[in-house]
Regions:
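Alpha/beta-hydrolase active-site loop
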Residues: 106-126
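Conserved alpha/beta-hydrolase
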Residues: 87-100
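Short beta-strand element of the alpha/beta-hydrolase
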Residues: 59-67
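Short beta-strand/loop motif that positions the catalytic acidic residue
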Residues: 182-184, 188
Length: 243
């Protein structure tokens, strides 16, 4: 049975690239032989790229948002290919293209959130995708971008965020939130668990549809078996919300 690829404990780990290189060689990509296609669209007068994985899949779309290390981390593509084997089409968005810097500033969050919203608009204009349901899946900084987009009542069917936070700029101008899954580590010293708890409280106050799980032994980034559990929870959540 094909298993999801393994992420390193932390994106900032100095040995991440070695771990990724080893893991990527072990991951059986031959199961999914199709090549990754690259497309572009305009957002805020800038050209933004995204990779399409699972183009032949007929199921829902997942817009995947990378973390602070950027889209070059190979295992994001590995996870995208794993989701494609489950009949999802994954759009791996290079949202950094939408701003001049990679800094997590209010200005950049606004540009990145707009890129996500504009990509959803592109999907709705595409005859092959216009009737498909859409989910957002973000990791760390990308999870914060997904939450920012969700807070503006973006017309998607689900949002899954792994160890992110809702940026203050978007917290204060909240418009809504699609059904949300929050996954976080109790010992996260990068984006603390208080951020997840704040979003959970917001969901209760606003009566948003929200599921959550706090891993008691995890930090920023999940190690097996928590990682495998997070993948399963995400797939189960999408299967239910995108049915």
């Amino acid at each position: 049975m094909l298993s999801p690829p393994k992420f390193p404990k932390k994106e900032r780990d100095s040995h991440s690239w070695l771990l990724l290189a080893i893991a990527i060689l072990l991951f059986p990509f031959t199961v999914l032989a199709e090549s990754i296609q690259v497309a572009r669209f305009t957002s805020g007068e800038r050209q933004v790229s995204y990779e399409i994985v699972g183009l032949e899949s007929s199921g829902p779309l997942i817009i995947m948002l990378h973390g602070a290390s950027g889209p070059g981390v190979p295992l994001y593509r590995g996870l995208a290919q794993y989701f494609a084997t489950k009949n999802y089409t994954v759009l791996f968005l290079h949202y950094f293209d939408a701003a001049d810097t990679f800094r997590a500033s209010d200005q950049n969050y606004i540009a990145w959130e707009k890129a996500v919203s504009d990509l959803v608009g592109e999907c709705r204009k595409n005859p092959k995708w216009s009737n498909r349901k859409i989910a957002l899946l973000g990791f760390s900084l990308g999870a914060s971008v997904a939450l920012a987009a969700g807070s503006q009542a973006i017309p998607v069917n689900a949002v899954a965020e792994w160890y992110g936070s809702l940026p203050d700029e978007f917290f204060f101008r909240l418009k809504g939130m699609p059904p949300l899954l929050i996954l976080h580590g109790q010992h996260d010293d990068n984006i603390t668990v208080a951020n997840a708890q704040q979003i959970m409280q917001l969901c209760r106050m606003k009566s948003f549809t929200c599921g959550s799980h706090i891993y008691p032994d995890q930090g920023h980034g999940f190690k097996p078996p928590a990682y495998d559990d997070a993948v399963k929870r995400t797939l189960d959540f999408f299967s239910y919300q995108l049915r």
